Amino acid sequence: MASSQGKNELKFADWMATLPESIHSIPLTNLAIPGSHDSFSFYIDEASPVGPEQPETVQNFVSVFGTVAKKLMRKWLATQTMSFTGQLGAGIRYFDLRISTKPRDPDNELYFAHGLFSAKVNEGLEEINAFLTDHHKEVVFLDFNHFYGMQKYHHEKLVQMLKNIYGNKMCPAIFAQEVSLKYLWEKDYQVLVFYHSPVALEVPFLWPGQMMPAPWANTTDPEKLIQFLQASITERRKKGSFFISQVVLTPKASTVVKGVASGLRETITERALPAMMQWIRTQKPGESGINIVTADFVELGDFISTVIKLNYVFNEGEANT
């Protein structure tokens, strides 16, 4: 998993550790960081029930067509083909996480979910932690941004799970502009947890969701997506938060019907890839530039290496900081 950057070899599993020293003190809000959309969706289980957030039309479709319907759903819901470990080794550092309970589950277990249920949350978090233990200078952003069927007890369970798994690796919520690699390394922090629920206000290591805004274009048109991304960056607040550019196309119902057997990757993502990659290559990180960039099927089109290499503009003294 390596690529060249000038005379330097970028080892993507340790790309943060190998950034030039001149970048170590730059706030992470100003760096370019690759992330994945619906990060857990590689694990989506066709044998699972339909998620509680799905509309009645989808529930009815599955009740009539059963396993066939779920196989077709997975083609459109699974936005990643790599496990957490695979994504981390390839350089992904931001994870988009959606959590759900299962109806009538006596164990009150927590699952990743997007339409269908995915892996158990504790298993996914343990997998990420194992990587961090082996790569002690790498830092991850865990963004818990959707919760389905969760009561106060479930949030308490998730908070305790985070404590048990990550412990002192978690960076408490502070002013975002203070967080640099140097700061995190000095304190042995490797995990920033963003939590889009009022629960975040009660727990020191949970960063409020508003500190990780992720404007959503909600379009199937690559040109409209790029216009939206550019406008969002232009309007980005100069200080106070991280920022996500979702380089992601969202299928409409009519799109799904037309390409029902092909799936998201073939019908939309691969066709739009050249335009989206060209947009990324023209960007610069910095206060008024891109920060975290997310995509579907992150292994496509040199997405990860392209985002990481944008950071080397700081070394050339050209960044907007």
UniProtKB/Swiss-Prot annotation:
UniProt keywords, alphabetically: Cytoplasm, Hydrolase, Lipid degradation, Lipid metabolism, Transducer
Protein name from the UniProt record: PI-PLC X domain-containing protein 3
Upper lineage: Eukaryota, Metazoa, Chordata, Craniata, Vertebrata
Domain of life, per lineage: Eukaryota
Residue ranges of domain PI-PLC X-box in the record: 22-197
Enzyme active site: H37, H114
Keyword Hydrolase belongs to the record: yes
Subcellular locations according to the entry: Cytoplasm
An example Gene Ontology molecular-function term: phosphoric diester hydrolase activity
GO BP: any one term: signal transduction
Keyword Hydrolase: yes
InterPro entries xref list: PI-PLC_domain, PLC-like_Pdiesterase_TIM-brl, PLCXD1/2/3, PLipase_C_PInositol-sp_X_dom
Tissue specificity statement from the Swiss-Prot or TrEMBL entry: Widely expressed, with highest levels in brain, followed by heart atrium. Not detected in small intestine, nor stomach.
One of the record's GO cellular component terms: cytoplasm
